[in-house]
Swiss-Prot record:
Subcellular location: Endoplasmic reticulum membrane; Microsome membrane; Mitochondrion inner membrane
Origin organism lineage: Eukaryota, Metazoa, Chordata, Craniata, Vertebrata
Cofactor(s) annotated in UniProt: heme
Key words of the record: Endoplasmic reticulum, Fatty acid metabolism, Heme, Iron, Lipid metabolism, Membrane, Metal-binding, Microsome, Mitochondrion, Mitochondrion inner membrane, Monooxygenase, NADP, Oxidoreductase
Name of protein: Cytochrome P450 2E1
């Protein structure tokens, strides 16, 4: 080896030692949770399986314990695994860990709205939005009638399939999308409306793309990948198109606004903006309102739609469960009356199935990232302000002590020995604490009423033998994505 080669090798070696020394000093000075040693630039990327990051978290938790530290690039991440640790983060330290971790794919919504907002306005905007949603019937009788009305449209659309195979992705999605559209815009779309179908396509495509390995990479190395071609560009383009549509609706609402008679949530937000017109510090702006409404539109459509669709696939896999549901529906509701939320008390098996669907699919397995709002002592460790916190929901929903055989779909997980519904505090698909899903009450009502209505009127018929149906997700990242499938719905006599 030449003298120059030896010199370069020594310089590289010294640089590596220096980086290791700096990392150890920083790590020890903060008394962070344990974790694997990070490499320069990429951090612990090689410890993560990009096609199934939750699986990687489980493996690392077995090695380092329920609270451990990772570095993804230069970003410090503390992963919290298991019921006790997750509960402590979300509830016992709800203020300290209430920030929103950065999601670069949604930078168009950063520091605005209620989902991706990590700015000073999110608490006030979220509080007002939740209050307004409750006033418009979120989780109460007002939304029950909304969902029941939409169930009629859904059932009619299903009848029009005439027992022929169809892909349920968008037909099923029309119902929850129309429910949230009514709350936001006081608008009902026809199931064949091209703009309506386009919006649902954008919602669905983004949810799928966010769960791909490329988006996992992009969200952790945005500065390196931003200018490269890739699906992150498609996500951002879709976000911009959705935002443009919502912006047009908000402008239309402003032009016809009557402050004394708000028609929907968008009007209520605009009324607050008008009140602040002469204020030096404004909480509500046109752009902020647009992002808030877009957040609710996306979340209120895609999560419930995907859960319902995944639920239908699971029920076709287990026809004996579907048959038990038919029997309970016939006994409690009968063939004619539309299902009501009061029926849930008399339908423990349906209630258990709805809960088990949500537990089993673990729609957002690693939660949305939180962030430490200040230096915090947690379980004897010091978590610095700005640290990304990942409370893994799948580790709670798949706890094998609370849910024996968690990898199996078993409604009995939510039934006691007498067949009555049994609630579990481990049931946290909507997260908990300051960042709990704003639409939890609405989603729970939609899932029960819409699934009950479908099974009241139809038998589900798969195109293959139930034993051959694969209910494994095709991607596990931001969400758990079900496989595409077709089915037939056969009217019950």
């Amino acid at each position: 080896m030449s003298a120059l080669g030896v010199s370069v090798a020594l310089l590289v070696w010294v640089a590596v030692l220096l980086l290791v020394s700096i990392w150890r000093q920083v790590h020890s000075s903060w008394n962070l949770p344990p974790g694997p040693f990070p490499l320069p630039i990429i951090g612990n990327l090689f410890q993560l399986e990009l096609k199934n990051i939750p699986k990687s978290f489980t493996r690392l938790a077995q090695r380092f314990g329920p609270v451990f530290t990772l570095y993804v690039g230069s970003r410090r991440v503390v992963v919290v695994h298991g019921y006790k640790a997750v509960r402590e983060v979300l509830l016992d330290h709800k203020d300290e860990f209430s920030g929103r971790g950065d999601i670069p794919a949604f930078h168009a919504h950063r520091d605005r709205g209620i989902i991706f907002n990590n700015g000073p306005t999110w608490k006030d905007i979220r509080r007002f939005s939740l209050t307004t949603l409750r006033n418009y019937g979120m989780g109460k009788q007002g939304n029950e009638s909304r969902i029941q009305r939409e169930a009629h449209f859904l059932l009619e659309a299903l009848r029009k399939t005439q027992g022929q195979p169809f892909d349920p992705t968008f037909l099923i999605g029309c119902a929850p999308c129309n429910v949230i559209a009514d709350i936001l815009f006081r608008k009902h779309f026809d199931y064949n409306d091209e703009k309506f179908l386009r919006l649902m396509y954008l919602f669905n495509e983004n949810f799928q793309l966010l769960s791909t390995p490329w988006l996992q990479l992009y969200n952790n190395f945005p500065s390196l990948l931003h200018y490269l071609p890739g699906s992150h560009r498609k996500v951002m383009k879709n976000v911009a198109e959705i935002k443009e549509y919502v912006s047009e609706r908000v402008k239309e609402h402003l032009q016809s606004l009557d402050p004394n008679c708000p028609r929907d949530l968008t009007d209520c937000l605009l009324v607050e903006m008008e009140k602040e017109k002469h204020s030096a510090e404004r909480l509500y702006t046109m752009d902020g309102i647009t992002v808030t409404v877009a957040d609710l539109f996306f979340a209120g459509t895609e999560t419930t739609s995907t859960t319902l669709r995944y639920g239908l696939l699971i029920l076709m896999k287990y026809p004996e469960i579907e048959e038990k549901l038919h029997e309970e529906i016939d006994r409690v509701i009968g063939p004619s009356r539309i299902p009501a939320i009061k029926d849930r008390q008399e339908m423990p098996y349906m209630d258990a199935v709805v809960h088990e669907i949500q537990r089993f699919i673990t729609l957002v397995p690693s939660n949305l990232p939180h962030e430490a709002t200040r230096d915090t002592i947690f379980r004897g460790y010091i978590i610095p302000k700005g640290t990304v916190i990942v409370p893994t929901l799948d580790s709670v929903l798949y706890d094998n002590q609370e849910f024996p055989d968690p990898e199996k779909f078993k409604p009995e997980h939510f039934l006691d020995e007498s067949g009555k519904f049994k609630y579990s505090d481990y049931f946290k698909p909507f997260s908990a604490g300051k960042r709990v899903c704003a639409g939890e009450g609405l989603a729970r009502m939609e899932l029960f009423l819409l699934l009950s209505a479908i099974l009241q009127h139809f038998n589900l018929k798969p195109l293959v033998d139930p034993k051959d149906i694969d209910i494994s997700p095709v991607n596990i990242g931001f969400g758990c994505i079900p496989p595409r499938f077709k089915l037939c719905v056969i009217p019950r006599s």
